Curated annotation (Swiss-Prot):
This is Thiazole synthase. Pathway: Cofactor biosynthesis; thiamine diphosphate biosynthesis. The active site is at K95 (schiff-base intermediate with dxp). The keyword Disulfide bond does not apply.
């Protein structure tokens, strides 16, 4: 069971809504992966009516909506988008995204921290997308963010946990949930994140662009479950030396 702010989730796999060939395929994949929290970009939905092709099936499915501020380049733009989302969707949950460079889509640490502090003061449950910077993640936690969402690699790159060393530090020092976001390309990446101690992962591109998104969604669900179970089972420690699993000489001594 995963708890973030005032909500609990059975699934440790969060998903997005971008890049799917159709809203029907999107919903089939979401159901297949068992995600209970789904992020959506405010610029992609019709906020004036809930019969939007993306929004309507999500509301009907009863998943927790996590609107994001993707496209915002400054703290001011992100705060403006956050208020639009709260008014239109009736939720104070927000994935804070501020990335000024459209080529790399890397989060702006200064603007993110500035916006996060103000949004928390304004009553939002803030989950910030951020770089894998242990100092920044601790500062975001200190200003009241409900979780932190450090990247594994650039958005949509499918490179995996390129920031593993920093993620391990973030996880070790965090007192709020850590959700690894961005760059997860295959189910084994998700399993590794849960094994190392992450509370959840957010996966979008890897599922949406797969040849078979629904089966890929199932694969991610199983990988996340496996990674979490492995961590809870207490993996053995790593060693530079070999350790025999069976006696090497006992049978010789017994035959003498």
């Amino acid at each position: 069971m995963l708890r973030i702010a005032d909500k609990t989730f059975d699934s440790h796999l969060f998903t997005g809504t971008g890049k799917f060939a159709s809203s029907q395929l999107m919903m089939e994949a979401i159901r297949a992966c068992g995600s209970q929290l789904v992020t959506l970009a405010m610029k992609r939905v019709n906020l004036r009516q809930h019969n939007d092709a993306i929004l309507e099936p999500l509301i009907a499915a009863g998943v927790t909506l996590l609107p994001n501020t993707s496209g915002a380049k400054t703290a001011e733009e992100a705060i403006f988008a956050a208020h639009l989302a709260r008014e239109a969707l009736g939720t104070n949950w927000l994935k804070l995204e501020i990335h000024p460079d459209a080529r790399w889509l890397l989060p702006d640490p200064i603007e993110t921290l500035k916006a996060a502090e103000k949004l928390v003061q304004q009553g939002f449950v803030v989950l910030p997308y951020c770089g894998a910077d242990p100092v920044l993640c601790k500062r975001l936690e200190e200003v009241g963010c409900a979780a932190v969402m450090p990247l594994g690699a650039p958005i949509g790159s499918n490179q995996g946990l390129e920031t593993r060393a920093m993620l391990e530090i973030i996880i070790q020092q965090a007192t709020v949930p850590v959700v690894v976001d961005a760059g997860i390309g295959v189910p084994s990446h998700a399993a590794q994140a849960l094994e190392m101690g992450a509370d959840a992962v957010l996966v979008n591109t890897a599922i949406a662009v797969a040849d078979d998104p629904v089966n890929m969604a199932k694969a991610f669900r199983l990988a996340v479950e496996a990674g979490l179970l492995a961590r809870q089972s207490g993996p053995g420690s790593r060693s530079h030396f070999a350790h025999a699993t069976s006696p090497l000489t006992g049978f010789l001594e017994a035959s003498e």
